[in-house]
């Protein structure tokens, strides 16, 4: 067995020849390489598939017998210092390797068609391959130095992919924002590594954990300094996994191509932070304050991400805030010491979120066919609707991903999320209440995304569409009924429907049920036809894009089975519990109690009930707009609803403004940090130019005039020199007499 494990170091390097050959081909044979660009997708998939098979083989070996293999090469620089490089294969490495490769293969298959017409096709596949190489190197690293090197490579290629369409100013700014925000976390991570090395004298995990544990229990190092080093290490994960308050880069990262959004949010960049905390959890366990901080940051991120997703119009940005919230669940679990639950949710969320992003990419790809390449239009959910008839496979896949993320049984995320919620009751009832209530928010905003995208009818065909929330009709698509501004104008229902149209439209006739007869009849009432031809509609995506989505549907349906919490005769029978090291599950060690069905079912009933409640609320507010018009007429009867109605509208608008403006956190950073630093830079420029340079230049000018004065006095005549000498003596005598008389 050891003979097989010693070749595991080659895993990260297997896909590396493809980007190298692409680079050589572009240098030597640029025309031919670009002409045969589609050929390069096949070796990329083949080599990544080999890595997946190798990872699966190691997974099976470790499942049969838990075995941790580490191989180290020592590079001695001098007698006092040496660097050690190696690779580590343990259950965490196997899980992450399979996750990266399976999600990566589906995304690459999808990208082959999605990026087919893009001029940067070869550049995209090169970046994607190097991204996988960096992430595989990260998860197989045996020490902190290797992790930091691969950590920086993961960040670099993610920035290149976020700013892939760098000619668009928005994409370039998003890349810059991600880079600057992660610089804060990476610098913190580097300081933590250096601090730990100064304390322990080692970068290797095994030695590091043992020495650190002894230092804490023997009080050989000040506890504050140990806590500071641990906090600095956590700072790296804080930024990389988009945890509050360094989460601001993640929504803007949606400016990159949709396949890279799927990869970043599912199994690579944001997962790197969770992996780092999981890898260093033996170190954090002996620092209770750090564990409490991790769980506190996690619960804040859970709630904040869910609330900020409530009113997003951009479909990818809504999913980005969803990722932020789900990463908060994982961080909460790690802070509680629930190692198994965190990794379980990392696995299930990866497949569900990859499915959702690929579904969103399929929708965007189809919308671009007739709205043109404009992210403001093709990604705007207010312009969508009615896609259920035109994209049935995408709709079914997206619905299953949505239900999974909402925590609806028996889909994958139900089992993992409820494991975290069940453990949260053991850790802190307050955290458990917040985490459970957030499941309702999750179900609400995810079904809001689904309903606005697929239900109803295609909204882009409306002539009086306006993206502004003050619009009289489309405020329905934001909160389910008219905004307060429309209600206060006291316009009748017929007036509302005839605004900006040449002819009035009669909606309420005797046969109201004909409203649902067909899409053409529905849109005819609102659409001004230049010709009698029907308008184009989105079409289902190509089979090359649908195949990966179907694969991810299978994972979403069945991957939850690896962690179903069976418990018989004090033996955990689920695959994940058997696979992971049991001693690291700190929470259950403290409680001296394992999770079983008697605890799981009541807690799951509560969370599922809240999820269904969120789904019902979303269905009431965001069901198809045309079916809601009778309800809108009923609302107009209560225009003069009194102060309670006005107060409710104000509260609703405050919530909407908070969510749509990202909690004003970006604005706060722009004012306090960006403008503050700019003001400080202007002040330092003024101080340097006027004060520092003023003193230097002033001394020069003073010396110049002093020299000129002396030059004028010294004309070469002896009488002038004697007169000057006599004046100086008199001045000296005068000052001396003055000091003597007044006793100074």
UniProtKB/Swiss-Prot annotation:
Q: Name the keywords, alphabetized.
A: Chloroplast, Membrane, NAD, NADP, Plastid, Plastoquinone, Quinone, Thylakoid, Translocase, Transmembrane, Transmembrane helix, Transport
Biological processes annotated in GO:
ATP synthesis coupled electron transport; electron transport coupled proton transport
Annotated GO molecular function terms are: NADH dehydrogenase (ubiquinone) activity; quinone binding
InterPro entries per the UniProt record, alphabetical: NADH_UbQ_OxRdtase_chlpt_su5_C (IPR002128), NADHpl_OxRdtase_5_subgr (IPR018393), ND/Mrp_TM (IPR001750), NU5C-like (IPR003945), Proton_antipo_N (IPR001516)
NADP found in the keyword field:
yes
Per the UniProt record, which EC number(s) apply here?
7.1.1.-
Show the stretches that span the lipid bilayer. 9-29, 41-61, 89-109, 125-145, 147-167, 185-205, 219-239, 258-278, 280-300, 327-347, 354-374, 396-416, 425-445, 546-566, 600-620, 722-742
How it assembles, according to the record, is: NDH is composed of at least 16 different subunits, 5 of which are encoded in the nucleus.
Function field: NDH shuttles electrons from NAD(P)H:plastoquinone, via FMN and iron-sulfur (Fe-S) centers, to quinones in the photosynthetic chain and possibly in a chloroplast respiratory chain. The immediate electron acceptor for the enzyme in this species is believed to be plastoquinone. Couples the redox reaction to proton translocation, and thus conserves the redox energy in a proton gradient.
Which family is it part of?
A: Belongs to the complex I subunit 5 family.
Q: Which NCBIfam families match?
A: NDH_I_L, PRK06590.1
Would you tell me the protein name for this molecule? NAD(P)H-quinone oxidoreductase subunit 5, chloroplastic
> What is the originating organism of this protein?
Pelargonium hortorum
């Amino acid at each position: 067995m050891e003979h097989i494990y010693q070749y595991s170091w080659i895993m990260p390097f297997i896909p590396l020849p493809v980007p190298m050959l692409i680079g050589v081909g572009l240098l030597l044979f640029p025309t031919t390489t670009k002409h045969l660009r589609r050929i390069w997708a096949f070796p990329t998939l083949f080599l990544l598939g080999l890595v997946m098979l190798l990872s699966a083989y190691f997974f099976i070996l470790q499942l049969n017998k838990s075995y941790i293999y580490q191989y180290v090469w020592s590079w001695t620089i001098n007698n006092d210092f040496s660097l050690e490089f190696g690779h580590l294969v343990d259950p965490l490495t196997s899980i992450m390797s399979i996750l990266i490769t399976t999600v990566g293969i589906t995304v690459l298959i999808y990208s082959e068609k999605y990026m087919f017409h893009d001029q940067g096709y070869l550049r995209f596949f090169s970046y994607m391959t190097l991204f996988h190489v960096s992430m595989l190197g990260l998860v197989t690293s045996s020490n902190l130095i290797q992790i930091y090197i691969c950590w920086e490579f993961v960040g670099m290629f993610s920035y290149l992919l976020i700013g892939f369409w760098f000619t668009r100013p928005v994409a370039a700014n998003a890349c810059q924002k991600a880079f600057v925000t992660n610089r804060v976390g990476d610098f913190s991570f580097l300081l933590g590594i250096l601090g730990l090395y100064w304390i322990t004298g080692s970068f290797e995990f095994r030695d590091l954990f043992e020495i650190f544990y002894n230092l804490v229990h023997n009080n050989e190092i000040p506890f504050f300094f140990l806590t500071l080093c641990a906090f600095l290490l956590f700072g790296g994960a804080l930024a990389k996994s988009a945890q509050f308050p360094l989460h601001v880069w993640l929504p803007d990262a949606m400016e990159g191509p949709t396949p890279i959004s799927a990869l970043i949010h599912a199994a690579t960049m944001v997962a790197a932070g969770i992996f780092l905390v999981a890898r260093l959890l033996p170190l954090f366990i002996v620092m209770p304050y750090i564990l409490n901080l991790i769980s506190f940051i996690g619960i804040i991120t859970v709630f904040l991400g869910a609330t900020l997703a409530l009113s997003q119009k951009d479909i990818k940005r809504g999913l980005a805030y969803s990722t932020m919230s789900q990463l908060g669940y994982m961080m909460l679990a790690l802070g509680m010491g629930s190692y198994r639950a965190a990794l379980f949710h990392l696995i299930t969320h990866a497949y569900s979120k990859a499915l959702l992003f690929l579904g969103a990419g399929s929708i965007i790809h189809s919308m671009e066919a007739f709205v043109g390449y404009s992210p403001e239009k093709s990604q705007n959910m207010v312009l969508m609707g009615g896609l259920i008839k035109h994209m049935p496979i995408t709709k079914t896949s997206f619905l299953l991903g949505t239900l999974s993320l909402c925590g609806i049984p028996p889909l994958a995320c139900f089992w993992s999320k409820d494991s975290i919620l069940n453990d949260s009751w053991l850790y802190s009832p307050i955290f458990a209440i917040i985490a459970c209530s957030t499941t309702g928010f999750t179900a609400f905003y995810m079904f809001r995304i689904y309903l606005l995208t697929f239900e109803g009818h295609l909204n882009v065909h409306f002539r009086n569409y306006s993206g502004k929330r003050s619009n009289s009709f489309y405020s329905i698509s934001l909160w389910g009924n008219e905004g307060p501004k429309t209600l206060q104008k006291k316009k009748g229902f017929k007036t509302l429907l005839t605004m900006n149209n040449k002819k009035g439209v009669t909606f309420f006739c005797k046969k109201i049920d004909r409203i649902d007869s067909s899409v053409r009849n529905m849109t005819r009432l609102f659409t001004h036809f230049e010709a009698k031809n029907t308008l184009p509609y989105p079409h289902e995506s190509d089979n090359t894009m649908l195949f990966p989505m179907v694969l991810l549907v299978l994972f979403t349906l069945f991957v939850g089975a690896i962690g179903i919490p069976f418990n018989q005769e004090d033996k955990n029978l689920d695959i994940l519990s058997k696979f992971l090291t049991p001693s690291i599950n700190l929470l259950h060690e403290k409680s001296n109690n394992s999770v079983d069905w008697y605890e799981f079912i009541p807690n799951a009933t509560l969370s599922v009930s809240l999820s269904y409640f969120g789904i019902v609320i979303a269905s009431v507010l965001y069901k198809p707009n045309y079916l809601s018009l009778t309800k809108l007429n009923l609302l107009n009867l209560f225009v003069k609803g009194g102060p309670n109605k006005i107060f409710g509208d104000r509260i609703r608008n405050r919530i909407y403004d908070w969510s749509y403006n990202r909690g004003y956190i970006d604005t706060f950073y722009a004012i306090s940090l960006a403008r503050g630093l700019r003001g400080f830079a202007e002040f330092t420029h003024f101080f340097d130019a006027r004060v520092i340079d003023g003193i230097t230049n002033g001394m020069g000018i003073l010396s110049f005039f002093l020299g000129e004065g002396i030059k004028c006095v010294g004309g070469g005549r002896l009488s002038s020199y004697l007169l000057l000498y006599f004046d100086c003596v008199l001045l000296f005598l005068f000052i001396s007499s003055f000091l003597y008389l007044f006793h100074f």
